[in-house]
């Protein structure tokens, strides 16, 4: 298998370590290739697969992005590429429900639930009095909550934003955090809350809908958004 970036053939993801082979040429072979397309690129690139008579799957990592960047007049084209897909890969139970609502004619056996992988580095370390959160998630909500919490926290507790960090640094921060505030919003699965819980933190906040399937006590406390 290999990864092909249609807009940048020299692209190589640097957000995490990997040894993935990168493909630098097209078109695809009807006999040799099977293409997996993320949902936000489904319309333009699934259509190209149809033109080349090449098998493909659409990987829906966030059901709330099914029509992202697609104008209403192109919804029938989008419907066609989902209808003609060999498989639809779904990241969560919530995402599967959304797919079935949007495209009820798709046979259930063509929708395959996949399970995300969590990096091995997300483990509990020596806990400190740290409440961590990711400010890029619902920034206005996190800013307001931090404002109200600031004067009410004991002096030996601190609020720590997680931003502009490598995966390893995020894992280290979560490992030392006692509490993680979740501001997930319209998420396909929402990995950060799960990573925080696996790192031994108590997770408090929003499920973003996608995390509902694992947001259970005693590791999680759900707050309605």
Regions found by a protein language model. Give the residues of each.
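Extended catalytic core of nucleotide-activated donor transferases of GT-like folds
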Residues: 4-84
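Conserved catalytic-core segment of nucleotide-activated headgroup transferases in glycan assembly
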Residues: 93-170
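Short alpha-helical segment that forms part of, or immediately flanks, the ligand-binding pocket
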Residues: 171, 194-198, 212-213
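Short glycine/proline-enriched, acidic/aromatic patches that form the donor-sugar handling elements
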Residues: 189, 209-214
């Amino acid at each position: 298998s290999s990864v092909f970036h249609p807009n940048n053939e020299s692209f190589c993801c640097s957000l995490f370590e990997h040894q993935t082979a990168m493909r630098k040429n097209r078109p695809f072979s009807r006999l040799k290739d099977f293409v997996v397309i993320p949902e936000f690129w489904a319309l333009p690139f699934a259509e190209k697969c149809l033109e080349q008579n090449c098998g493909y799957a659409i990987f829906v990592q966030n059901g709330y992005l099914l029509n992202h960047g697609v104008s209403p007049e192109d919804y029938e084209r989008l419907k066609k590429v989902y209808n003609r897909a060999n498989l639809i890969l779904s990241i969560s139970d919530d995402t599967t429900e959304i797919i079935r609502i949007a495209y009820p004619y798709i046979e259930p056996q063509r929708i395959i639930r996949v399970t995300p992988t969590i990096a091995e580095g997300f483990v509990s370390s020596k806990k400190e009095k740290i409440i961590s959160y990711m400010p890029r998630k619902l920034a206005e909500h996190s800013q307001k909550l931090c404002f109200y919490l600031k004067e009410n926290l004991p002096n030996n507790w601190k609020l720590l934003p997680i931003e502009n960090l490598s995966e390893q640094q995020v894992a280290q921060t979560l490992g030392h955090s006692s509490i993680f505030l979740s501001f997930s919003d319209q998420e396909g699965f929402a990995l950060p809350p799960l990573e925080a819980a696996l790192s031994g933190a108590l997770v408090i906040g929003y499920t973003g809908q996608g995390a509902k399937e694992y947001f259970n006590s005693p590791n999680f406390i759900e707050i309605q958004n």
